[in-house]
Amino acid sequence: MLIEYIQAAMTHAEFEQMENGRYFGTVPPCQGVWADGETVDAMRETLREVLEDWLIVSFRHSIEIPVVDGWDINPKPVAEEYAETHQAA
């Protein structure tokens, strides 16, 4: 599920070439996730790493993670998760 979230978030990546020739990119749904690089590929690779680190920090500090394309990876209380998976038919 985490890999799918990262892939979905990366489809929202926006980037531009700066005046100095480097590339700058962000993932708008994930506030604070940005990177730059000498090439688009280098920037995208760094951007993905920053997104992964941002998720770790968000989990560690119980910061709500935005739902992206239906992917909700926020931790749920055990009782709520149990109720969702064991609903009466």
Task: Give the positions of each predicted feature.
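Short, charged, surface-exposed hinge/linker loops at domain edges
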Residues: 1-12, 45-89
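Structural detector for hydrophobic anchor residues on beta-strands
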Residues: 11, 23, 33-35
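Acidic-residue sensor for enzyme active/binding pockets
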Residues: 16-19, 38, 52, 81
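Short secondary-structure boundary micro-motifs
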Residues: 9-10, 17-20, 40-42
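Short aromatic-glycine-(Arg/Gly/Cys) micro-motifs in beta-strand/loop hairpins
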Residues: 15-30
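A short, exposed loop/beta-hairpin motif centered on an aromatic-Gly-Thr core
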Residues: 31-42
